[in-house]
Amino acid sequence: MAEGFAVNRQWIGPEEAEELLDFDIATQMNEEGPLNPGINLFRVPGITETEKQEYCNILQPKLQDLRNEIQEVKLEEGNAGKFRRARFLRYSDETILSLIHLFIGYCTYLCKRNKLGTLVHNIDIEAPQEECYSNRERGTTVNIKYSRRCCIGTTALYLLLLTGIIIYTQTTQAQVVWRLPPLVVPVEESEIIFWDCWAPEEPACQDFLGAMIYLKASTNISIQEGPTLGNWAREIWGTLFKKATRQCRRGRIWRRWNETITGPSGCANNTCYNISVIVPDYQCYLDRVDTWLQGKVNISLCLTGGKMLYNKDTKQLSYCTDPLQIPLINYTFGPNQTCMWNTSQIQDSDIPKCGWWNQIAYYNSCRWEQTDVKFHCQRTQSQPGTWLRTISSWKQKNRWEWRPDFESEKVRVSLQCNTTKNLTFAMRSSGDYGEVTGAWIEFGCHRNKSKLHSDARFRIRCRWNVGDNTSLIDTCGNDPNVSGANPVDCTMYANRMYNCSLQNGFTMKVDDLIMHFNMTKAVEMYNIAGNWSCTSDLPSTWGYMNCNCTNSSSTDSNKMACPKRQGILRNWYNPVAGLRQSLEKYQVVKQPDYLVVPREVMEYKPRRKRAAIHVMLALATVLSMAGAGTGATAIGMVTQYHQVLATHQETIEKITEALKVNNLRLVTLEHQVLVIGLKVEAIEKFLYTAFAMQELGCNQNQFFCKVPPELWQRYNMTINQTIWNHGNITLGEWYNQTKDLQQKFYEIIMDMEQNNVQGRKGLQQLQEWEDWVGWLGNIPRYLKGLLGGILGIGLGVLLLILCLPTLVDCIRNCISKVLGYTVIAMPEVEEEEIQPPMELRRNGRQCDMSEKEEE
C-alpha cells in the first residue's frame, strides 16, 4: 500500500479501495442510510489480484470522492458509528413488540424487559453443550410458555372490558329530552313576543311576511287560557305609529334637480343663472295621515320568534292575523268598539269612557251605531289679485306654472262643508291634544283627480259657534245663565254649509313623547289653489258612539242641564283600546323547545311489540294536533313556514352572518330559524339555543336527545314516572305535569350559554364520541356503507404502502423467534461462482450432529 502511494499519490490501489469501501458501508449503516447498504467487492471470497485491479479502474472516480470525503470530515466516535443502524432497528423492533404485548394484555413483559439478557453462542467452543432441564421444563420451550401467558392475558383483558361495558350500560341511563314536540302551549305573560306587520305595497312592513298569511291549520285541540295578542296592544300601536311616520322626517330629500333660469334676452350679458331645486318629502305626511293614521290600510300582524296565534273563534292556528283596519289616532268615527261608563271600575286608561258628565247633565247608556254619514266640501277662490310666476315644486319637469297668490289679502278663499245627517255632539273632548274650543269636528276628505288638480286627501276641521268667551269649555247648551260655561250649539245640521279649514298640523302623544306634525308645506304641495271639491271616504262599516243624556236630581239652576236627549261622543275612538279589542280573540301560543320524556315512556311495551320512537311520535301527533276539519295539519303548516323562511334570503344572510361571528360549528337552521324577527334579543337566543343543543349532541335531524345522568342529577330533576299511564294522556297534560322540569332544563342550557363552572363540568361529562361522530347520523345508510368502504380501502392501501417492508420484516422475525431459528444471511455472488450454503440452525446446532461434525 505504501509503495502504491509513493509511485502515484492520485491512484487508489486495491488495499486503499478496500478500506474506503468499508468506510462507505459503515457510513451507510447509520440511521440515515438504506436498509441494505451492500457488500465490499474487494472482500468477495476467491477474488484475484487481476479482478481487484479491474475493480479499481472501474471504481476510481467513486474512490476519489470517498478519499476527499475522508479528508474533509473529521472522523470521531459520534460520526458514522458502525452498526448504529443495526442497533436502531433492534431497539425499534423491541418497541414494536412492547406495544403489541401491551395491546394484547401481556403487561408483565414490560416489567421483565430490562431483566432479559442476550443469548450468545460461541461457535469456537470444542466441548458440546449439555442439556440441563427440569421435569417441568422438559418438552416446553420459552415461546410456548409465553404464548400461553399471552392467550390467557388477552382473554382476561377483553372479558374485563366487556363486563365493564355491560355494567355501565345497565346502571347509567341518560335522560331523554324530546326536541320540538308537536304541540302548542300558551306563552307566559312575562315573555317577550316579536312581531312585524304586513300590508300590500307598504315598504314599512316586511314583504316576505305576506306568504305567511295563508299558513293556517285547522285543529281540534283544546288550549288552556293564556295571554292574547291584545295584551301587547299598546306596544303594537306605538310601533305602528312610528312605522307610519318614520319615513316622513323633516329634512329628507324627496326630489332634487338642477335648473337654469333665463332672462328676457336668454343668457346674453350673463342674465341666466343655475339653481338647485330641493323638495323635502312632505308628501309622506299626508299619505301616512290619510292611510295609516286613519286606519285605511289593511294591516296583518305576524308573529315571529317561534310564536303562533290561536284564533278562538275559528279554532285555527296561524302565524298572522286577518287583515285589520287599525286607526292610530283618536277619531269621532271608527270601527265597533266597546266602552265603559263606570269609571271607578276602569283599570285600563285606554278603555274609552261611555259618556261624559258636566254639572248636572249625564251622558250615559252609550252604544255604537253604524252610520253612512258623508261630508262634502267645496273650495272656492276669488280671481282678483296678483299672479306669481313660480316653479312647480312637485313635478320633476323644467317648466313654469302660473298660479294665483292665494296668500294675498286680495284673494278670497272659502272652504265650506256640509253633512248628510244631523250630528249632535254630547260633550267637549280632546282633539289631538290641541287647544280647540267651541263646536268642532275633524274628518278626512278625498279629492278626485282632475285636469287641474291631482288626486289627494286632506284632513279638514270644521268649527262653528265658538262663543263669546273662548277660554271656557263648550257646553252644547243654550242657557246663558249657566256659571262656568260658554253656551254654544254643538249640533251640525244636515245640508247646512259650515266654514272649515285645512288642518295643517296635529299633535300626537306616543308613550311619554308628544310629537307635533306640521303639514303646512305638504298641504301646499297638493296644489290647493283654485276651485275643487272633496268627499269624505269613511269606511261603510264605521260608526260613532251615541249616548243618552239624563239630568241628575239636583235642582241647581246655575248648572248646565241636558241640552239634547242624545249626543255623539267626539273623538271617542281610542286606537289602543280598539286594537286591543280586535286582538283579544288571538291567543299567543308557542311550540315548546323540548319536552322531558319519562323513562316509563321509553320502556313502555304494548301487547305485541315495543313502542318505537316513530310510534310515539305518531301517537303524540294524533293526541295533540290531528286536524278535525279539512284544513291542513299544524305539522304541515310548520313545514310550510320553514319553506317560507328558507326563501327569505335577507333573513338567512343576517342570521348566518351572526352565526359566523359566534363561530358555531353546527347550525340547526331548519328547526331554530323560527326566530326571524331580526331583533338582537331574538338572534342572541337563537345562537344560545343552537350552541347548547349542539353541545348536548342534538343535531337538526335528532328529535330525541340524551342528557347525561350526571348533568341531570346535578339539578335535582326528578320526574313522575306514572304520568304516562299506558299512553292515556295528551301531550298538553304531559307538558303541564313536567312544566317545572322544563324550567330546570332551561337552567342547564343557560349554564352552558354563560360558560359558568357547572355548565363547563356538564359539557366535560358529555359523550365526546357522540359529538365527534354525530354528523354521521345525517348520512343515509347506503352512503355510510359506500363511504366506509372507500375510506377502508384507501386506508388499507395507504397502510400497506407505508408499512409493508416493516411488516414483512416483523413477521419474519416473529416466526423465526417462535420456531427458535437464527437466520444467518451470506453475501450473494455471481451465478457461476459456488454459493456457500445458508443454514438454519436450531438452538445453535443441526439435528443429530455434534459441533465437531458441523464444523
From Swiss-Prot:
Cellular component per GO, a single term: host cell plasma membrane
UniProt key word NAD: no
Location of region: Immunosuppression: 661-679
Disulfide cross-links: none
Source taxon at top rank: Viruses
CDD domains reported for this sequence: HIV-1-like_HR1-HR2 (cd09909)
Ranges per topology, Cytoplasmic: 806-855
Transmembrane segments: 785-805
GO BP term, example: symbiont entry into host cell
Entry-linked InterPro entries: Envelope_glycop_lentivirus, GP41-like
Topology Extracellular: residue spans: 1-784
Coiled-coil residue windows: 642-692, 735-771
PTM note: Specific enzymatic cleavages in vivo yield mature proteins. Envelope glycoproteins are synthesized as an inactive precursor that is N-glycosylated and processed likely by host cell furin or by a furin-like protease in the Golgi to yield the mature SU and TM proteins. The cleavage site between SU and TM requires the minimal sequence [KR]-X-[KR]-R.
Fusion peptide: annotated span: 615-635
Residues the UniProt record annotates as site (Cleavage): R610, A611
UniProtKB keywords: Cleavage on pair of basic residues, Coiled coil, Disulfide bond, Glycoprotein, Host cell membrane, Host membrane, Host-virus interaction, Membrane, Transmembrane, Transmembrane helix, Viral attachment to host cell, Viral envelope protein, Virion, Virus entry into host cell
Region called Disordered, residue ranges: 835-855
Matching Pfam families: Env-gp36 (PF09590)
Subunit text: The mature envelope protein (Env) consists of a trimer of SU-TM heterodimers attached by noncovalent interactions or by a labile interchain disulfide bond.
Function: The surface protein (SU) attaches the virus to the host cell by binding to its receptor. This interaction triggers the refolding of the transmembrane protein (TM) and is thought to activate its fusogenic potential by unmasking its fusion peptide. Fusion occurs at the host cell plasma membrane.
The protein's name in its UniProt record: Envelope glycoprotein gp150
